[in-house]
Amino acid sequence: MAGFTAADVKKLREMSGAGMMDAKKALEETGGDLEAAVDALRAKGLAAVQKKSSRTAAEGLVGVAVEGTKGVAVEVNSETDFVAKNDQFQDFVRKTTAVALTIDGDDVEALKAADYPDGGTVTDKLTNNVATIGENQQVRRMKTVTVSQGVVVPYVHNAVAPNLGKIGVLVALESDASADVLEPLGKQLAMHIAAAFPQALDADGLDADLIERERKIAAEKAAESGKPENVQEKMVEGAIKKFAKENALLSQVFVMDNKTAIADVVLAAGKDAGTTITLKDYVRFQLGEGIEKEESDFAAEVAAAVKG
């Protein structure tokens, strides 16, 4: 089909959970635009809400490190998962993450130019690794969180090595409570963040473009209901409030008990400790967010559908 390929149909199905023919039709209607096709499927109730880039594939590792009241997450990409399991690559990610703790802010270019523990710069070591391992690699991004008093708690979901894996989380808790109180709380919150994929700390932090996209989808659904315009407006506002509640960390329902808002979990922990605990910030890095991986082999049924 003009405008899209079998790979696009396959990717849309992965992104949306829609059936093959529904995915094909959506791509036809949107001229092959994947994001628009997802929105079209959702407006028709044929696709589940997908977290931003949650299914995009790329290889490599996310590293996390903490020193004092500062924590950092770093993503380093490779072409294959085989390299991600390589001891040399893992050592590079681990040491580069440690170097990132010395960088002010989230300047990945400054990280690349920084001194590497074994000599030269981070980029020099990366170039050497590419030559010896025989595969392209890239230091992609970094994110730092700090507290003036309290703890930053690191967590890696399904770690392949200490502090290395495909999902890395940092939780920044501001408080005068002891580490014995804060660290277990931070670990539970980090596990929640890894599972629940919040888009921002609170509703005010949600990306305006993301909200506008959800508003457009909600408006299309409301219009299809055939209800009066004033009712449609209430439906749209209700949908946006629900989206914000489900995607802002502080209003999300804690996955550990499936009933308590994260803000209330933190509040209760502070009361139990006889002090105030503030969830100041967090980082959630999932390997490959926003990176498209080239497809080289497609299911026969997808190819047949596109040709059909």
Curated annotation (Swiss-Prot):
GO molecular function, one term: translation elongation factor activity
Any Pfam family the entry gives: EF_TS
Top-level taxon in the UniProt lineage: Bacteria
Identification of the protein by name: Elongation factor Ts
Annotated compartments: Cytoplasm
Cellular component, GO annotation: cytoplasm
Keyword Secreted: no
Keywords tagged on the record: Cytoplasm, Elongation factor, Protein biosynthesis
HAMAP family cross-referenced by the UniProt entry: EF_Ts
Cited function: Associates with the EF-Tu.GDP complex and induces the exchange of GDP to GTP. It remains bound to the aminoacyl-tRNA.EF-Tu.GTP complex up to the GTP hydrolysis stage on the ribosome.
Native organism: Erythrobacter litoralis (strain HTCC2594)
Protein family: Belongs to the EF-Ts family.
InterPro entries named among the record's database cross-references: EF-Ts_dimer_sf, Transl_elong_EFTs/EF1B, Transl_elong_EFTs/EF1B_dimer, Transl_elong_Ts_CS, UBA-like_sf
Region (Involved in Mg(2+) ion dislocation from EF-Tu): 80-83
Keyword Disulfide bond assigned: no
